[in-house]
UniProtKB/Swiss-Prot annotation:
The keyword Magnesium applies. Its main location: cytoplasm. GO terms for biological process: glycolytic process. It catalyses: (2R)-2-phosphoglycerate = phosphoenolpyruvate + H2O. It is an enzyme of class 4 (lyase). This is Enolase. Mg(2+) binds at D241, E285, D312.
Length: 425
């Protein structure tokens, strides 16, 4: 089915900042749309998110230039192409851009069209998006890793590390895992309130209290797991994303929100090894900075046999960078963010490379999200087994969980739940 029109518009994300929505229409009248997210803590090697830098509009964060690139540069070249030829469409947009990091058109322009094309193709064939992208065997529901305490760049508090997540893995299905996570989220709220802490939430829906230390964040989560009636490590484990690239200053890690202390790479590895021995941590994302490859190698050698070590800023969903990490024996898992690389095809290529080399894949939202649920379908399509998309509140986060509930119902008896094997080393 041929594409007859492509239109882009400027709309708002969950932080009130502009983002790009694209709509694709076909000759049979089918239409589909998609909206791109935006990150706060971003890797240096991410594809370029094009902003207008006009101080008179949205504080310089407008995306009218990216919208114009879709309507004026991309649409004329893509109209008339077969909507199911995702790879050719993505390749054409990359060729038009002409840069390695999509700096001309903007990854937000290219990805909006790429995602909208995939969704419209699925609709035209009468298929759910997960089935269209993943084929007949797509049936694995992920563990919902829920970000219940926010720190770092995601919250205005004294916690250095960015995300403290719960992973409810000992469940018979996704729906029950989500229930376990939501109950723990509410138990945590009760505990924080009882301790006199604020229960306001950060960008991703997690609480953002002024805790006394980073360790206290883990300890109150463990209390919440027990208060909700579950066993830490047996039913629900902990995933961390300290986002240490944001802490990397002058060759050391600066604890910039708490006590202003610093640690060397060796000391950070010691810290994570200590935490892994003390707490039920199944996954550690960006435990070292994106440019600290020696530190990453030390961390992988030290705890990589027992803990999932996820490269986010390190790899930026980029197959070429992942290949370098594989060759060097760095990390054992990769975070998947569509807008880090900027097209559906390239994202699928990166996932394929990771799976080929026994690296786990962990699909992720961004801190500036929307009601778009593409990543829920992508997670099932690729059998990733893990997704992080915020906490148990904020509708732009819950939208992804609700889509996964729908997918599980659609699959019926064919649905499988990843469980703790999603993190297994």
């Amino acid at each position: 089915m041929l594409i007859t029109s492509i239109e882009a518009h400027e709309i708002l994300d969950s932080r009130g900042n502009p983002t790009v929505e694209a709509q694709v229409a076909l000759e049979n009248g089918t239409t589909g749309s998609a909206i791109v997210p935006s990150g706060a803590s971003t890797g240096e090697k991410e594809a370029v998110e094009l902003r207008d830098s006009d101080p008179k509009r949205y504080g310089g964060k407008g995306v009218l230039s990216a919208v114009a690139n879709v309507n004026d540069s991309i649409a004329p070249e893509i109209i008339g192409m077969e909507v199911t030829d995702q790879r050719s469409i993505d390749r054409k947009m990359i060729e038009i851009d002409g840069t390695a990091n999509k700096a001309t058109l903007g990854a937000n322009a290219i990805l909006a069209v790429s995602m909208a094309v995939a969704r419209t193709a699925a609709l035209s064939l009468g298929l759910p998006l997960y089935r269209y992208l993943g084929g007949t065997n797509a049936s694995l529901l992920p563990v919902p890793c829920m970000n219940v305490i926010n720190g770092g760049k995601h919250a205005d508090n004294t916690v250095d590390f960015q995300e403290f997540m719960i992973a409810p893995h000992n469940a018979p299905n996704f729906a029950e895992a989500l229930r376990m996570g939501a109950e723990t989220f509410h138990a945590l709220k009760s505990i924080l309130r009882g301790k006199g802490y604020s229960t306001g939430v950060g960008d991703e829906g997690g609480f953002a209290p002024d805790l006394k230390s980073n360790e206290e964040a883990v300890e109150v989560i463990l209390l919440a797991i027990e208060k909700a009636g579950y066993r830490p490590g047996e039913d629900i484990s902990i995933c961390l994303d300290p986002a240490t690239s944001e802490m990397w200053k002058d060759g050391k890690y600066l604890f910039f929100k708490s006590d202003q202390s610093t640690k060397t790479s060796e000391e950070m590895v010691d810290l994570w090894a200590s935490w892994a021995g003390q707490y039920p941590i199944v996954s550690l994302e960006d435990g070292m900075g994106e440019n600290d490859w020696e530190g990453w190698k030390m961390l992988t050698d030290r705890i990589g046999a027992t803990v999932e070590l996820v490269g986010d800023d390190l790899f930026c969903t980029n197959a070429k960078i992942l290949a370098e990490g594989i060759e060097k024996g760095v990390a054992n898992s990769i975070l998947i963010k569509l807008n880090q690389i900027g097209s559906v095809s390239e994202t699928l290529d990166t996932i394929e490379l990771a799976v080929k080399h026994n690296y786990k894949c962990f699909v992720s939202h961004r801190s500036g999200e929307t009601e778009d649920t593409t990543i829920a379908d992508l997670t099932v399509a690729t059998a990733a087994g893990q997704i992080k998309t915020g906490s148990g509140c904020r509708s732009e986060r819950v939208a992804k969980f609700n889509q996964l509930l729908r997918i599980e119902r659609q699959l019926g008896e064919a649905a499988r739940f990843a469980g703790k094997s999603a993190f297994a080393r």
